Regions:
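Extended, composition-driven regions rather than compact fold-specific motifs
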Residues: 2-212
Length: 212
């Protein structure tokens, strides 16, 4: 499902991690005076034996991990802690609503691929424009793309307007929503009010926060 890992990278792309490097080591070695490591949560798109796929969103003014992803080469090392998950639908769930920006779409897709054949879903995927969406074999044809166009990530209103106009039966519905923290908070309040959802029918996670 939406398994996510905490990835830790070193300022030196050629850095080799010691055996049994842990989250404790990360916290101990990073001080106010010296912080050679950076870390952030990323969701796992897919898992194979001895391999995992993680999607990075490359953008202007990237953070340390996005910079690392652009420069990484074969055998570049990264430390990982986890996985964890926030996708926990209650028993009896029959339909799903996935709402995600670029950072959360891998988690949504991984969750969709684990649904049973008789379970229905709707996806609202936000991205910049037609050129930044990806192709996906969607047997139910239930992925709806919402484009920000010239609006910066974390500032668009089209996704919220689409959510406000949703008409869904809340019975046996589970909502997974993740993306920019402030937008997710607004969407959560909107859905809770409009659909009268119980707490166990919702998973809302801020994957990142817009600053400035």
């Amino acid at each position: 499902n939406d398994a996510f890992m905490y990835l830790i990278i070193h300022n030196d792309l050629n850095h080799k991690y010691p055996n049994k490097f842990s989250m404790h080591d990360f916290r101990e070695l990073n001080t106010k005076e010296n912080n050679p490591y950076s870390g952030a949560y990323y969701t796992i798109r897919s898992i194979r034996e001895n391999e995992i796929d993680i999607w990075f969103v490359l953008h202007h003014n990237p953070g340390p991990l996005a910079v690392w992803a652009e420069k990484a080469v074969e055998k570049s090392e990264v430390a990982m802690w986890g996985p964890r998950t926030s996708f926990s639908p209650p028993n009896g769930t029959k339909s799903y609503l996935f709402i995600a920006d670029e950072t959360a779409q891998p988690a949504a897709l991984a969750s969709i691929e684990n649904l049973r054949d008789n379970e229905k879903y709707i996806c609202l995927f936000e991205t910049q424009n037609e050129s930044t969406k990806f192709k996906y074999d969607d047997p139910q044809n239930r992925i709806e793309w919402i484009f920000r166009e010239d609006i910066a990530a974390g500032e668009g209103t089209k996704l919220l307007k689409r959510v406000e106009n949703l008409s869904m039966d809340p019975k046996n519905l589970y909502v997974f929503c993740a993306g920019e923290a402030k937008q997710i908070s607004i969407i959560r309040k909107t859905l809770k009010k409009n659909l009268s959802l119980n707490a166990d029918q919702m998973s809302f996670t801020g994957y990142w926060r817009k600053t400035g």
